[in-house]
A protein has these predicted regions:
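Structured, basic alpha/beta domains of bacterial-type, RNA-associated proteins
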Residues: 1-150, 154
C-alpha cells in the first residue's frame, strides 16, 4: 500500500537527494528554466515555490533561511532583488512543469520546469564563455587573396 508516502526517494540517499535539489534550485533560479526527468521536476516544483515565497518576505530571518537552503549568495540575491519583485502580486504558482518527451538513451520521461513570466535572456548568462574561445578559422583565411600575375624571366 502507498499510504503516507510523503515524497519521492529517487533511488538516492537522503544526503544525495538534498544536494541534488539544492543544485537544481540554484540552477532554476539562475537560468529560470531547466530540463530534467519528470519525477525530479514534480518534486522540485513545491520546493521552488516555497523558496520564492520565503524570498518575498524580504527580512533578515528569511534571508538566513534561504542561504541555509541554497548556500549560494548570487541565488539569494537574485531571489530577493529580481524574483520577489516580479512575483509580488502573485500568490503562488511561480513555476510550471511541461512534459518534454522521452530521453533517447534510457527512454526516461523528460520535463521542462520553468518559472512563470520568466526572463528569456536568463538562459544566455554563460554564452560569453563560449564566444570568447578562439575560433578555428581566422578572418584572414576567409578572405580571398588577390592573385598577382607572375612574369617569367627569359634566359
Amino acid at each position: 500500500m502507498r499510504h503516507k508516502l510523503g515524497y519521492r526517494k529517487l533511488s538516492r540517499t537522503s544526503e544525495h537527494r538534498k544536494a541534488l535539489f539544492k543544485n537544481m534550485l540554484n540552477s532554476l533560479i539562475k537560468y529560470e528554466q531547466i530540463t530534467t526527468t519528470l519525477p525530479k521536476a514534480k518534486e522540485l516544483k513545491p520546493k521552488i515555490d516555497k523558496v520564492i515565497s520565503l524570498g518575498k518576505k524580504n527580512n533578515l530571518s528569511s534571508k538566513k533561511n534561504l542561504f541555509t537552503q541554497l548556500q549560494s549568495k548570487t541565488s539569494v540575491d537574485k531571489l530577493i532583488k529580481v524574483l520577489s519583485q516580479r512575483y509580488e502580486k502573485r500568490n503562488g504558482g511561480y513555476s510550471r512543469v511541461i512534459r518534454a518527451g522521452y530521453r533517447y538513451g534510457d527512454d526516461a520521461p523528460l520535463a521542462v520546469i520553468e518559472l512563470v513570466d520568466r526572463d528569456i535572456q536568463a538562459k544566455k548568462v554563460d554564452v560569453k564563455k563560449k564566444i570568447e574561445t578562439p575560433a578555428k578559422t581566422t578572418p584572414e583565411t576567409k578572405t580571398k587573396k588577390e592573385k598577382t600575375p607572375i612574369k617569367k624571366q627569359s634566359k
